[in-house]
Structures are given as C-alpha cells and as structure tokens.
C-alpha cells in the first residue's frame, strides 16, 4: 500500500478556536514505508522541528490565498520537480477541492512541505495512512489521532458549501417534525433489534460459537446503519441529507478510514450546521413575507407590530452571524474539527436576544389572538399570506414560535454531539461548556415566560379572594401557583333534627402556591372565601388504602400549623386516583413515597418516549415534545404518569397515551448513561448533600 512521503508534512496543521487540536506528540517514533525513489532522499534529510501555525493566523491565511491562486500547471511542475511519479500527484492542495473520480484517495498522495511537519509525520503513521494496525498496535483504537491527520489534508471550497446551504429546501418547521419522527422510529428499531439479539442469545446458550457471534453483532453494527436524525429529510429541493452523502466526502475516501463513531460524530455536527441554515431560512421568510409586508404595516399599529414581532430582527442577525461562522468552519475542512466552541461563544455572548424574544411570548400570543378576533383585515391578509407556496401551508403562529423552538433544539443537538465525542477529550470539555451555556439560556427563557404569566395570574387570584380569617398577602415576586382545584372534605356522619343524614362530603377549593396553601369555599360571583391556610413546608399527607368504595381516592392532609397557629387535619376525597396522586405529590413533595425517591436514578427505572406532543393544562403537568425520553416515577391506573424528563430533569404529570414504553433494559441503561454524561458538570458534592437532606427529612416523618 502506498503512503505519504516526507512532503506530507507540508500542509499547515488545522487548529480550532478553542485549540482542540493541539500538538500533543513528540517526534514521530515510526516512519511509514516509502517508495524506492524517495526513501534514500528522505533518510538523508535532517529532522526539522517546526511550530504548528494557528488556523486563523495571518501567515496561514496568506499561505492559503497563495496556494489558491496557484494554477494547476504550476502545481504539476512542482510535483515533477520533486521527482514524484505521475500517478501519485497530490489532489489535496488547500482550497482546491476538485477530486476527479479516477484519482487515488487523498491519504495516499503527498502534500507539500511546510509548517507543522513534525505532527504530520506522526499522523501519517496512523492506520489508513500506509501503516497497518499490526505495525502500529497502539494506534488501532485511536480515531482521534486519525482525525487529526485528516484535519490537515481535506479542505473544501467555499462555493461548494454555499451551494449546499442554498439548496436546503426545508423550512425549519418541516425539518424539526421530520427529524423528531425519525428519532422516534430509530429508537423503535434499536429497541426491536437489541431485543431480537437478546432472544437469539438466550436460544443459543448451548452453542458457544453461536453465542459469541450474537454478542459480536451489537458491538460492531454496520457503519451505515447508525444514521443521524436528519436522515429522513429527503426533499426534491435538497440534494444532500447526510455528511457522508456529500460528493466531496464520497470522492475523498475519508469514509474508508474514519471509525464508525467518528462518522456518527461528523453527522451530528453536520446536522447542527444544516439545521441552523434551515432555521435562518424560516426566520428570513417570517421577516420578508410577513413582517415587512406593506399592507400589514398599514393595518397594524406600531405598538401592535412591536409586540407581535418583538426583536425578531435581532434574533435573525445573530443567527446569520452564527451560521456564517459555522459555514467558515465547514469550508476549512470536510472533516469537521468541532462546532461546539462556536456554539459556546455565541451562547455566552450573543444568545441573550432569545431571552428577550421568548419572554415576550405571553403578550405575543394574546395580541395575535386579539388581532385575529377584532381586525377582519388582519385576519384576511394573514390567511392570504399563509396560502403563498413559500409558506408550504404553515401558519404565521408556527413562524412566531421559531426562536424558542430553536434554542431548545440547539441544546439537544449539542447533547447529541456530546454523546459521541471521546470521553476525557478537549472536545468533550468544549461540548460540556456549550451545553451548560445553552441550558442557562433555555432556563432564562422559561423563567421569562413564567414570570410574565405568573404575575398576571397572581393578581387575578388576589382579586377573587375574600378572607374569613386574618388576611394573607398573596402577591409576591417569589410566589407562584403550583396547583388549584376542587376537592371534597369529609365532614363526618351527622344527623339533623329531622333525622335525615347530612351530606358526608362538602366541596372545598384549594390554591397551592410554592410556599403557601390556601383553603377556600367557592361562593357566588366567582369568588372564594378563605377559611384556613398554612405554609407549604408544614404540610403532611397520608393515603388511605383498602377503605372500600366510599373512601376510595381519599387522603389525609395535616397542617402542622394553620392560620390559628394550631394543628388541623382534613380528610379529602379526589375525583380519581390520578387526581389524588397529583395532589399528594404537590402538597408534600418530600414525603417518603416511591414516586419522589431516588428511583429516577436507578438503572431499572421504567422509561417512555413521547410519540405525541402534549401541552400542559395545569401547573403540575409537563409539556412534552416529540422524542422526549422520561423516567416513570409513578403511574396511575387511570392513565396518568408522573415522570422526569432526562435532558433537563423537569418533572410533571402527563397522559400515558402520549408516550410509549421503552421495554429493552439495554436501551434504558444507555439512555441513563448518556444523561449522566451530559449532566456530569454539576457539582457532585452539592447533589449528594441535597440527597442527604431529602433523605433526612423523610426519615423524620
């Protein structure tokens, strides 16, 4: 097998912004086999130790322009002057990525001598570059070293990448729906495949050879079967769906030497870039087709237009700059070094525009509904604009919610990258940093939305309350509603003078805040008369079991210190088992029960994935997006689940009909492992102390 000669050292080493590809090796200990023509010449050369050139340095940029301006005839003349065979001419000159089908793969061809020669010599000794795994056993399982070699020899022309971006025909809404549906289907196939392998393994226990074959199958899956989430995005207007389907990738031969896991990582990073291009296209359509429509400008008052579109221009400007940097990273090499360093920088310095936009969501939705109801001209014009083929049948509301969907999806895309990078590597550290920054942005967005809606909700509740006891201030910046609803209070069997039994239960209404419980009775005029209250931390609950049909779904609520500074006990009946469980979970979340214990962290905890989106109807419910994975903490007989979402650890109730259970224990274990890896930057000592406090509070009860 032919290999690079010493001139392979001529390509300047590629470095990312966060120095992810630092030089970590000394002089090469092994040299690849050289052709007879060049072996003697190379042996007589004195070893040189050169400092690698930074990717964006002035020298490196000048060299790239110089090589780009050089004509093909000049390059051939240089090759002939170096006594190279005609059949081994280089096809990897910087920024000249025209790869004829008849030429040899680029890792077999020499490059020109230049800075970074020392590490190029080491990289040329990796498997796939002329040395077999038997000759270099230490490098057999070293995809990172192999990737560093590839980083130096595969530039991609800017025009090729820009053409790819322009040919993306999917709007972001289409991409998002198809991507999540494909993710669900991929999990189903993996679940069924691994279950099939497990069944086959058990059936062949008596045959040692068959057992070994079955164990090897899941460990070495076919390289092309591990498709990323974007693989179903087939579209007549978008030729390229996968990184490995790009003509430059196909003709370069890198797929023959990349490890399968590195290929998956490349696909994950490629999806982040192409999805950002699709998102920018949808934002641009929102601005050009809707916001800047002259007829719409005349219909809307400036204040209405400001609330409706908010700072979408700022969001689009940030997306444009973000996409431009991602494009530049793609142009540098077909083998992508990293994108998380760019994501981290933008999340830390520029993504605050998303917080501003999303925080306005409550007013935006209300204004949009009012305009549709009150302004006929607005409603008719929007309907007309939505019929335009550009919109592909999508409503304006789907465009207005794009920024919040994107910032959430971006965090998941970084998680997908994080799952595939090498553990302990610098790329893992950068991905963790990017994920942490994105998580902070998403939390700030959620808090912004909640703050706006909570303030209005607290004002509305305060107006409806009449206090029979000492008044309690309801409105507070640190207080919000967790749950409200009607329950039946058991008053006990009492007999009137006419010997007719009074009603065993009577209705009461509860308002549960994050720090306060208010117990009321509903009175005419949509008002509530408050007759008792207690701090939430002084509540205890107890479930009554096997008490017959009359006491079904009954639980005891104990106030350790109520409004009169006394202990009070209420026997309450809910309308269903799920309603009882939901009230008990909300009233005393730290009580000693199985659905708020550490079972969410156990490997045998049941899991489900969301197959139908669900919007929370109550504060204690959890909004679900397609492909969300959740641990089951509690499941009721009437079809409700209390679960914890893995990617953000949010808890809440949701209908079981919106999900399907993941049956295979290997898939569940893998999901938990990936979850632990994503969130491992959290302080373990802090989590341990928090768990100890929870355990202690339950033991005291």
From Swiss-Prot:
The keyword rRNA-binding does not apply. Residues 1-141, 187-226, 679-701 are annotated as: Disordered. Its main location: cytoplasm. Interacts with CDK5R1 and EPHA4; activated by EPHA4 through the CDK5 kinase. The modification Phosphotyrosine is found at residue 172. One of its GO terms (cellular component) is growth cone. The DH domain and the PH domain are both required to mediate interaction with EPHA4. Residues 120-132 have a biased composition (Polar residues). This is Ephexin-1. Residues 691-701 have a biased composition (Basic residues). Residues 480-592 form the PH domain. It is found in: Cytoplasm; Membrane; Cell projection, Growth cone. Residues 1-264 are annotated as: Regulatory region. The gene is Ngef. Phosphorylation by CDK5 upon EPHA4 activation by EFNA1 may regulate dendritic spine morphogenesis. Src-dependent phosphorylation at Tyr-172 upon EPHA4 activation increases the guanine exchange factor activity toward RHOA. Residues 603-664 form the SH3 domain. Acts as a guanine nucleotide exchange factor (GEF) which differentially activates the GTPases RHOA, RAC1 and CDC42. Plays a role in axon guidance regulating ephrin-induced growth cone collapse and dendritic spine morphogenesis. Upon activation by ephrin through EPHA4, the GEF activity switches toward RHOA resulting in its activation. Activated RHOA promotes cone retraction at the expense of RAC1- and CDC42-stimulated growth cone extension. Residues 264-448 form the DH domain. GO terms for biological process: cell differentiation; ephrin receptor signaling pathway; negative regulation of dendritic spine morphogenesis; nervous system development; regulation of actin cytoskeleton organization; regulation of GTPase activity; regulation of synapse pruning. InterPro entries: DBL_dom_sf, DH_dom, Ephexin-1_SH3, Ephexin-like, PH-like_dom_sf, PH_domain, PH_ephexin, SH3-like_dom_sf. Expressed in telencephalic neurons (at protein level). Expressed in brain, spinal cord and testis. It comes from Rattus norvegicus. Keywords: Cell projection, Cytoplasm, Developmental protein, Differentiation, Guanine-nucleotide releasing factor, Membrane, Neurogenesis, Phosphoprotein, SH3 domain. Disulfide bonds: none annotated. Residues 206-218 have a biased composition (Acidic residues). GO terms for molecular function: ephrin receptor binding; guanyl-nucleotide exchange factor activity.
